[in-house]
Every structure is written in structure tokens, then in C-alpha cells.
Amino acid sequence: MERWLQLHVWSKDQQDQDQEHLLDEKIPINRAWMDFLQMSPFLKRKLVTLLETVAKLRTSTVVYPGEERVFSWSWLCEPTQVKVIILGQDPYHGGQATGLAFSVSKTDPVPPSLRNIFLEVSACDSQFAVPLHGCLNNWARQGVLLLNTILTVEKGKPGSHSDLGWIWFTNYIISCLSNQLDHCVFMLWGSKAIEKASLINTNKHLVLKSQHPSPLAARSNRPSLWPKFLGCGHFKQANEYLELHGKCPVDWNLD
């Protein structure tokens, strides 16, 4: 009997473990996030297939961000430290993408949407010094998860990877954050981000909604259910909520 178990049960278990380990090696996400997400082998295979699709596209088109930066959000921000989640759409398609939503490197000009974000932080925090660069790494290191809902894009074609399969993965991340953490602040700017509100448990998290910070949205006179981004007060509300629940507020300064 023991021999039969060894051949037909234990050996299969070992094979399954080996296969799952191989899948893990193909997913360049911080191990802390892999442990946190607890993806099934099926979901891991699904993600690996998506990564292989993106890798194939890179052979014939320019894809942003670079392969090594797609999951940089996972390396700058540990899952158990997350306290604010800011959702973006897809990465910058002009070459500035860093893997963090809205962020650019210190050598790139600050994009218009990020300039408006800085204006709103200034209105919320008198101690905020408007930076000359748009690198948001300091926010990420404090537990601000800057997550695009689509993690790659073709050069010059916004939204070009929206149907590749990223949305199921980032929805899964949002759901895990909502389920496993307590008293986080989710900032949802624009209709695409606001669609994610249904994934978040509002009984234990604060969900803040506004129009998108882009200048186009700021100038628009179209009726909206949501307030304009400029004047929304999200950064002040976020820190007040964090302090109310015994968490350190975010220092929004970048330098």
C-alpha cells in the first residue's frame, strides 16, 4: 500500500509542487506579493501565458514599460505595508512609464496629469513642496500602491493592451487588498478607476472618487456624478482617515 501511495499519490504531489515552482520562477513579482496573492496554479498559468503574450509582442513592437519594470510596484511597496491605493489606467505610452501609475523618472518632464496631482496635494497639505520631478518612489516606499489596471502598452497607442488580460489580474490584486487588509484608502480617479469600486469592501476601507486629474477632464463641462479632481481634497481626507485608524499619515513630499 505504501509503495502504491508513493508511486501514485506522493509522486504526483511532488510533480505538482515542481510544476508550481517552475511557474513561480516565470513570474518576476516580489515573493512577498506572490505569498500575499496566493494564486492557484490555474491563475499562475494564466498569468504566465499573459507574460508570454507580452514577450512575443515585444519582438515586433515597442512595449512600455520595459520588461524589468512591469512589476516594479511590487518591489517598492510590500503588500502588508499598503495603506493607500491609487489606481491608474495604462502606462504612459511615450516612453516615460516606470511601472508605477502616474510616476516618471527624475529625468523626464512632469506629465500634465501629475502636475494637477501635485496642485491638489499642495491644496491639501501646506507642508508640501511642489517637486521639480515626477518620481513617486517615495510615496510607494511609504505604502502608497500606484497600480495601473493595465500593466503594459504599445508605444504611441494608449489602451492598446486593454484586451490582453491584465484586467483580471489587477482586479484580483484589488480584491486581495480589500479582503486581507484593513483601513486602507482607495483613490479612484475617472470612470475607469471608479468601476473598480465594486471590488472594495467599504465597511472597512475608505473609497474616494473624483474625475480624472488630466487637464482634459479638468476643462470638461460635461455633467458628472463625481467632483472635479482639483478641489477634491483626497490627500487630506486620506491622512485624516489613516490617523483615525492608528496608521502613520503619508508624507507627500518627494524629496
UniProtKB/Swiss-Prot annotation:
Taxonomic superkingdom: Viruses
One family name in Pfam for this protein: UDG
PROSITE patterns associated with the record: U_DNA_GLYCOSYLASE (PS00130)
BP term (GO), one: base-excision repair, AP site formation via deaminated base removal
Keyword annotations: DNA damage, DNA repair, Host nucleus, Hydrolase
Active site: 90
EC number: 3.2.2.27
Catalytic activity as recorded in UniProt: Hydrolyzes single-stranded DNA or mismatched double-stranded DNA and polynucleotides, releasing free uracil
Family of this protein: Belongs to the uracil-DNA glycosylase (UDG) superfamily. UNG family.
Protein name from the UniProt record: Uracil-DNA glycosylase
Species of the source: Equine herpesvirus 2 (strain 86/87) (EHV-2)
